[in-house]
Amino acid sequence: MKLFALICVCTLFAGFACAQSGTAVPGGQDTAALEQKVRDLEDRLIALEGQVRVLKAQAGQAPAATPAGAPTEAASQAPAPAENVAAVSAPVSLGGAGGSAAKALNPDISMIGDFIGYAGGNSIQPSPALQMHESEIGMQAIIDPYARGDFFLSFGETGVGLEEGYITFTALPESFVVRVGKMRSAFGKVNAMHNHVLPWVDRPLVTNSLVGGEDGIDDAGVSVERIIPFPKGIFLSATGQLFRGDSGSGDELVFQSHQKSDVSTVAHLRGYKDLNESTNLDLGLSYARGHNELGTNFVTSLYGVDATLRWKPLRRAIYHSFVGRSEFIWSQRQQAPFEQRAFGMYASGEYQFHRRWFLGGRYDLSDRPRQANLTDKGGSVILTYWPSEFSQIRGQYRFTDYAGDHRTNELLMQVIFSLGAHGAHPF
């Protein structure tokens, strides 16, 4: 039947072509007759196309053909000797997930371990000799065609906490992307990174002093992002975020809410461009505002500029690469008797000189937010080895010159390992 239908379709196409390309017949009646024939052929063609679709649907629903050499239905129904009959049992379902359809509803689950060792003295920011710094469990899944969910739990020696947990709506009009839950803010570059993504063992001094340390600006709120059309191959995106108003703790506290109206806000503008086939440049502007621990009438404002340069030659991509990162942050903190204006920055570079080896360095400088006349400086040299994409071993020498003539020399060792399907982090 399929072959017959295809022959009919080809015949109709040939007849239609002949009718169109044939010699013009004089007379209005003959022309009208030809036009009527063309319309009839078109109607028949449409009808045959419908029949072909019906045949295809029936073929898809038909049972699979019996393989050559397989027993026929009559043969399979023939009685067999009792001694040759084996008991056939249904396959046993192991685990509580059931079939593949049920397993598809389970999220991707991963665990990342972060073990750190310290050698050397640091009376300003002391650390234990050995510690399981943080273990992170991630659960990520597509919720429905309109949203996805992400949860990250952190397990440390001080307890368990929700690092991030949010739903992202990705199918909104006008290319808006909305995120609701607890999340790291889009301020700068380092603040949005989890510990295992950092190219160093620690975070820069400016992050610890001005942007809330390891936790950073991480709060419950709403984030709205949109890609802005821009010419000349420039990727431009804008993000606005509204948070409850609590970020950081202790000496690293940035914002603190005293009443429901004491919310904090964050804005970020990002521009990205490929300079050539091997190099790209990523620039960002950031702003954050919230109330500090002194009360509702005292506000802290942060301003930031970040830049990232990436180089990865296509022909030697697995052997050589370079990433340069830098952030500049200004802090305005209202407190008695005077407002404190602090500045901090870091500049770092990481060069891949072998398939699994990376060598990097970082320079740090940061004023203290509550005493801007005190400035801390430092430098680090970092060597990283990646046995595979699921683990990394890193050593870092860190020199810090704290305000008040306190100098420290430390050696930091880190082992990171990953289990399970961990989703990609923002580029």
Q: What annotation goes with each model-predicted range?
A:
Residues 116-122, 156-158, 187, 243-252, ...:
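Sequence/structural signature of outer-membrane beta-barrel proteins
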Residues 5-15:
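Bacterial N-terminal signal peptides
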Residues 278-369, 377:
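Detector for outer-membrane/organellar transmembrane beta-barrel domains
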Residues 91-248, 261-266, 270-280, 343, ...:
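Outer membrane beta-barrel
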Residues 224, 305-307, 383-385, 407-427:
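Outer-membrane beta-barrel "beta-signal"
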Residues 19-121, 414, 424-427:
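N-terminal periplasmic/intermembrane-space "pro-region" immediately following the signal or transit peptide
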Residues 119, 337, 350-352, 356-400, ...:
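Outer membrane beta-barrel transmembrane domains
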